[in-house]
Amino acid sequence: MSLASSLVVSSNVELSPSSFGFLDSVRDGPQIPDSFRFSSRNRVPNLINKKQKWGNHSHSTELKYPILHESGYGSVIVASMVANPAGEIAVSAEQKVYNVVMKQAALVKRQLRTAGELDVKPDIVLPGTLSLLNEAYDRCGEVCAEYAKTFYLGTMLMTPERQKAIWAIYVWCRRTDELVDGPNASHITPTALDRWEARLEELFQGRPFDMLDAALADTVTKFPVDIQPFKDMIEGMRMDLRKSRYKNFDELYLYCYYVAGTVGLMSVPVMGIAPESQASTESVYNAALALGIANQAPPNILRDVGEDARRGRIYLPQDELAQAGLSDEDIFAGRVTDKWRNFMKNQIKRARMFFDEAEKGVLELNKASRWPVWASLLLYRQILDEIEANDYDNFTKRAYVSKAKKILALPMAYGRALLGPS
């Protein structure tokens, strides 16, 4: 395994410690300081060109989501492709996501072939650089501890290098989400997101903008993390700016991948696959995708129906609402009827299928990484339980997991984390 390139930092560099003081820079355009540059290794190619026209592609049954092929769920995701009126090939959401998963898995498999095992790459650093990086990672840890307390506690069992890398990824994702959901969301435009993506590309080339970027720039030199899931998350933010309805689950699934499934793909290269795992790399990444979606999209979407409606947004499949005899007006009115309860039961059932799929993959992760993942899975599952306990009123009641239940989840998650691949 080759050594990572040296990290060079000027002695007079000044990095802002602010967690989220980046909105002005995004609006005005990135101003990357030359004094803080990570030498680029250019290891990771841009794996997916969104404008590429895909040819016929067959899916292995091992890699398919059985949960997406159950009957009775309206718009089933399939891998078929249909020509649109312009003569171009229209690709299903599953097809698009599948290609990203396969590319990420291939990247890690190449790493495994060259290194024998997936491990952290050692760095040669200048003395002043190390203290700055430690400060950057510490700040990421503080942000994670403040906004994701239970997950942060779970990371305490991870090795220091993996722990810091996960913190850096978490902070970047949070900052990205804040662009469209934070207090300054009304000022964010598509151009601002383009600038944020340009800043991401600079980061992956070893040119971070600020302290928190520096932590992630260091992380991507140590682990085989691909830029595409990060770009796809930004694409999810673009969807939030231009789209407030989803006509079927295929559309919604693609959105869920962008804003949540990407997190699973970002994290697995850092968390690592258990040495004793007999599962294929592709199947582990397939489960990682389900993990990211399960931990974020369905619970949050179903919990926040009322809140989203007050913002004029409906993150539910329009065709399935119609099949249930419901309309946008019913949601805006916040009526909890039998039709709504039956609709929600089906949505929760599908969400739990994502959790079931994700749990299969957790067993294949590196032992030290399983605890925070199990903690998140158990807690987000309970959001669905709380929606049921509220009699499916997610218009006026916000389902949340009590502090006591969060504390109880930690030892349970730890116990499950001890179980490895069968």
Swiss-Prot record:
Compartments, as annotated in UniProt: Plastid, Chloroplast
Molecular function GO terms recorded: 15-cis-phytoene synthase activity; geranylgeranyl diphosphate synthase activity; squalene synthase [NAD(P)H] activity
Pfam families linked to this entry: SQS_PSY
Record's keyword terms, sorted: Carotenoid biosynthesis, Chloroplast, Isoprene biosynthesis, Plastid, Transferase, Transit peptide
UniProt pathway annotation: Carotenoid biosynthesis; phytoene biosynthesis; all-trans-phytoene from geranylgeranyl diphosphate: step 1/1
InterPro entries: Isoprenoid_synthase_dom_sf (IPR008949), Squ/phyt_synthse (IPR002060), Squalene/phytoene_synthase_CS (IPR019845), Trans_IPPS_bact-type (IPR044843), Trans_IPPS_HH (IPR033904)
PROSITE patterns xrefs: SQUALEN_PHYTOEN_SYN_1, SQUALEN_PHYTOEN_SYN_2
Keyword Chaperone: no
GO cellular component annotations of the record: chloroplast
Main location class: plastid
GO BP annotation list: carotenoid biosynthetic process
E.C. number: 2.5.1.32
Catalytic activity: 2 (2E,6E,10E)-geranylgeranyl diphosphate = 15-cis-phytoene + 2 diphosphate
Top EC group: transferase
The keyword Transit peptide belongs to this UniProt entry's keyword annotation: yes
Transit peptide interval: 1-83
Domain of life: Eukaryota
Assembly information from the UniProt record: Monomer.
UniProt similarity note: Belongs to the phytoene/squalene synthase family.
Protein function: Catalyzes the reaction from prephytoene diphosphate to phytoene.
Name of the protein described by the UniProt record: Phytoene synthase, chloroplastic
Organism: Cucumis melo
Gene that encodes it: PSY
